[in-house]
UniProtKB/Swiss-Prot annotation:
The lineage of its organism: Eukaryota, Metazoa, Chordata, Craniata, Vertebrata. Keywords: Cytoplasm, Disease variant, Endoplasmic reticulum, Epilepsy, ER-Golgi transport, Golgi apparatus, Transport. Expressed in testis, liver, bladder, lung, spleen and brain, several cell lines and primary chondrocytes cell line. The keyword Methyltransferase does not apply. Plays a role in vesicular transport from endoplasmic reticulum to Golgi. This is Trafficking protein particle complex subunit 2-like protein. It holds the Pfam family Sedlin_N. The gene is TRAPPC2L.
Length: 140
């Protein structure tokens, strides 16, 4: 099951973080923050090939004993990070990739809202919040 979904701005500050259970919220914030180093390493290793790709699914960033952390980067360098419970062995790479695509599409809808200021935290979008909730339930 997905326990944390985060949207990180180009400048590496969180635009949106949602986690369950909430008593481990600080732990998930730390995991998301530490995964940004791995994301930067993968992006710099790709070099010029990064410019040619339409989407950048980074795959598994790093596993821990209880969780697996996956990453995705858009062309505008916005990063999506998903922390998944390691006990869920039924999740495949294709399913994680499609979840990131849904998250990216929903993020694009938020960006197209004329009342949203780019770079602000995503707080007032019920549609985005509902989509994240459905993704977290879907993975269970």
């Amino acid at each position: 099951m997905a326990v944390c979904i985060a949207v990180i701005a180009k400048e590496n500050y969180p635009l949106y973080i949602r986690s369950t259970p909430t008593e481990n919220e600080l732990k998930f914030h730390y995991m998301v923050h530490t995964s940004l180093d791995v994301v930067d390493e993968k992006i710099s290793a790709m070099g010029k090939a990064l410019v040619d790709q339409r989407e950048l699914y980074l795959g598994l960033l790093y596993p821990t004993e209880d969780y697996k952390v996956y990453g995705y980067v858009t062309n505008s360098k916005v990063k999506f990070v998903m922390v998944v419970d390691s006990s869920n062995t039924a999740l495949r790479d294709n399913e994680i990739r499609s979840m990131f695509r849904k998250l990216h599409n929903s993020y694009t809808d938020v960006m197209c809202n004329p009342f949203y200021n780019p770079g602000d935290r995503i707080q007032s979008s019920r549609a985005f919040d509902n989509m994240v909730t459905s993704m977290m339930i879907q993975v269970c």
